[in-house]
């Protein structure tokens, strides 16, 4: 595809974006809004943001959800701005510095919460700064200004949602149905590969792809949930399917690992059975029927526990999958599966990374303030706003540097584009609302095409161009103000990018170590006699952490294998029949405390000390298990876990 070509699949969203901009512009001028530019800018960002992230037209519900987040973030930011102004109106410099800290605080929170919800916190950070900077000449108008901003943001979001609904947004339901069938086939093929005990690299690639696909399916579930309330039953089922898919991966990989030491456990009966190739979900369905008959004939005791558990999970997967596709009423059998176990949320391992983001945002905003006060530049306030916007939005993404570059390219492209609109197009169309709307529709259409291609600078160009052209009520064509605004955007983006480069994020290795120690802690916590704790479902949280590890360290197979081994150990120990007595219960609590100390240790020396203590406690625990005559289902997993921790002691304790 050429650089200027237009693909058919990109046209509908481009028209949708153009319609959102035109509708917002018309409503803004019709109802005499003070600054229609804010409403138009909001509509463009809310509509184009999900398209840029998806690399095409977003699915139904994505624009609506982003709009709701923007409303929430705007209201939080406006309230924070009002509180800061009321408390510190007599000390303007202190007031701006507190706003810089507030922007950093919101970035810190946005780095810790779910990525989908982080947008609201990033927006809350720079909204307060916008209000404080804008009301400097007339602080008494603060409540009116905050109210106007909130109302214009809401107008822009409503118009974007209306445009989305008019052009019949894509439903993700068919994609979900297809992925469920494809995922089931891939799960069966992984089990075939593990029973065949193929090459380790091939198995690693297979289970790694399945982890990514299961995570992607969870993202699809979130989209489906946003799409419509009629998918509520499908949403409940998909939550259960996420756990079942992860269970299938775990059981398959444990089957592979068992054969490293005890290949005789997998009998020829099962090797021959799993040698039959499958191509479709129907093939898997037929094979599962046969497998259940084989297990009934062989007997539960003669069937490896991993294959027995895998067959049960695959059967439940099939049952729930049919319910998702048909979206029928949940049956009693399904309800029993869905009620299952309470899911434990993952604890963030990126606290140090979040603190780095806090300092990046705060320092860049403070530097912007000093630059503004030192130069006295009339558009220094605009530069400050861009600094806050870039740092608040860039920090929550995997590659902040590329986001900074995107904004720089976008603001540079916005200068000639904005100049064309400011000097030629808008002055010649302001007498006709129709011509004005058409001129902005053309801008939205072509930039909408580029946004879907994820062209570098396209998103920044769309927002920056709308921000600098005259869309106020009434319109004022002062070239010096236009030039100041355009240059302020560029300078702000360059300063923000400079801070991103200078304040380096060296938290990657620390995050990796924390993640690995969290896997160890999860495996240790599975050794318990507490019935409630044993029923907790840690699997989604553990695989979420594994997915983060895979993104942080692409291609680092030893780390992935260690993490997967810890997950397998957790699942095996969770189901192990640990003898119930006060002595073991007290020792379980002691080991959990030691594992928590390993995670929270601030220095390598303390971490090594607590880790050595944990290894010693595991040796004592194994002796206690022998004294209390624990069965092999308990002693063998504990012995394997102890061996793994001894083997990877250096990787788990060194920064």
From Swiss-Prot:
GO cellular component, one term: plasma membrane
Record GO biological process: carboxylic acid transport
Keyword Membrane: yes
One GO MF term: transmembrane transporter activity
Compartments (UniProt record): Cell inner membrane
Induction description: Positively coregulated with aaeA and aaeX by AaeR.
Transmembrane segments: 13-33, 38-58, 69-89, 93-113, 121-141, 152-172, 370-390, 407-427, 431-451, 481-501
Membrane topology: Multi-pass membrane protein
Pfam hit, one: FUSC
Keywords of this entry: Cell inner membrane, Cell membrane, Membrane, Transmembrane, Transmembrane helix, Transport
InterPro entries according to UniProt: PHBA_efflux_AaeB/fusaric-R, PHBA_efflux_pump_AaeB
Function (record text): Forms an efflux pump with AaeA. Could function as a metabolic relief valve, allowing to eliminate certain compounds when they accumulate to high levels in the cell.
The family this protein is said to belong to: Belongs to the aromatic acid exporter ArAE (TC 2.A.85) family.
Protein name: p-hydroxybenzoic acid efflux pump subunit AaeB
């Amino acid at each position: 595809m050429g650089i200027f070509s237009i693909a058919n699949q990109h046209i509908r969203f481009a028209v949708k974006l153009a319609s959102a901009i035109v509708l917002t512009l018309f409503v803004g001028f019709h109802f005499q809004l003070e600054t229609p530019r804010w409403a138009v800018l909001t509509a463009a960002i809310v509509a184009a943001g999900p398209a840029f992230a998806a690399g095409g037209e977003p699915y139904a519900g994505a624009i609506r959800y982003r709009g709701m987040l923007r409303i929430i973030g705007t209201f939080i930011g406006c309230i924070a701005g009002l509180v800061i102004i009321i408390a510190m109106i007599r000390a303007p410099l202190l007031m701006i510095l507190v706003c810089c800290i507030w922007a950093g605080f919101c970035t810190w929170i946005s780095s810790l919460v779910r990525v989908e919800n982080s947008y609201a916190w990033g927006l809350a950070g720079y909204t307060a700064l916008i209000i404080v900077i804008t009301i400097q000449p007339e602080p008494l108008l603060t409540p009116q200004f905050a109210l106007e901003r909130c109302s214009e943001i809401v107008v822009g979001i409503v118009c974007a949602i209306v445009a989305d609904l008019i052009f019949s947004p894509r439903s993700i339901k068919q994609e979900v149905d297809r992925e469920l069938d494809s995922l089931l086939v891939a799960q069966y093929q992984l089990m075939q590969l593990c029973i065949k005990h193929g090459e380790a690299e091939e198995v690693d690639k297979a289970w790694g792809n399945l982890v990514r696909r299961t995570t992607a399916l969870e993202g699809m579930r979130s989209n489906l949930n946003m799409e419509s309330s009629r998918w509520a039953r499908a949403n409940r089922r998909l939550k259960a399917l996420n756990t079942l898919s992860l269970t299938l991966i775990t059981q398959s990989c444990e089957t592979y690992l068992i054969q490293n030491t005890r290949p005789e456990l997998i009998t020829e009966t099962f090797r021959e059975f799993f040698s039959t190739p499958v191509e479709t979900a129907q093939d898997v369905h037929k094979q599962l029927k046969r497998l259940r008959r084989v297990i009934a004939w062989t007997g539960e005791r003669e069937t490896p526990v991993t294959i027995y558990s895998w067959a049960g999970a695959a059967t439940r997967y099939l049952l729930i999958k049919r319910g998702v596709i048909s979206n029928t009423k949940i049956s009693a059998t399904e309800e029993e599966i869905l009620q299952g176990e309470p899911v434990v949320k993952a604890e963030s391992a990126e606290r140090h990374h979040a603190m780095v983001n806090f300092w990046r945002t705060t320092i860049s905003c403070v530097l912007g303030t000093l630059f503004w006060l030192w130069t006295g530049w009339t558009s220094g306030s605009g530069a400050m706003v861009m600094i806050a916007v870039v740092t608040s939005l860039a920090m929550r993404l995997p590659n902040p540097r590329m986001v900074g570059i995107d904004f720089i390219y976008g603001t540079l492209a916005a200068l000639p584009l904005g100049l064309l609109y400011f000097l030629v197009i808008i002055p010649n169309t302001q007498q006709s609302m129709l011509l004005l709307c058409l001129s902005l529709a053309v801008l939205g259409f072509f930039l909408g095409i580029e946004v879907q291609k994820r062209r570098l600078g396209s998103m920044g160009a769309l927002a920056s161009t709308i921000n600098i052209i005259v869309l106020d009520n009434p319109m004022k064509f002062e070239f010096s103000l236009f030039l100041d605004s355009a240059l302020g955007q560029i300078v702000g983006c360059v300063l923000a990018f400079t801070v991103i480069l200078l304040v380096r994020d060296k938290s990657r290795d620390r995050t990796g170590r924390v993640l690995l120690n969290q896997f160890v802690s999860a495996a240790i916590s599975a050794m318990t006699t507490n019935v409630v704790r044993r029923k907790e479902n840690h699997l989604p949280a553990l695989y979420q952490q594994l997915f983060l590890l895979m993104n942080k360290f692409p291609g680092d197979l030893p780390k992935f294998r260690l993490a997967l081994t810890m997950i397998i150990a957790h699942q095996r120990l969770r189901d192990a029949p640990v003898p119930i007595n006060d002595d073991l219960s007290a020792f379980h609590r002691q080991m959990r405390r030691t594992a928590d100390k390993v995670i929270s240790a601030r220095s390598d020396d303390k971490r090594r000390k607590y880790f050595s203590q944990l290894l010693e406690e595991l040796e004592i625990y194994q002796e206690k298990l022998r004294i209390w005559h624990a069965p092999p289902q308990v002693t063998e997993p504990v012995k394997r876990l102890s061996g793994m921790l001894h083997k990877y002691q250096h990787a788990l304790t060194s920064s």
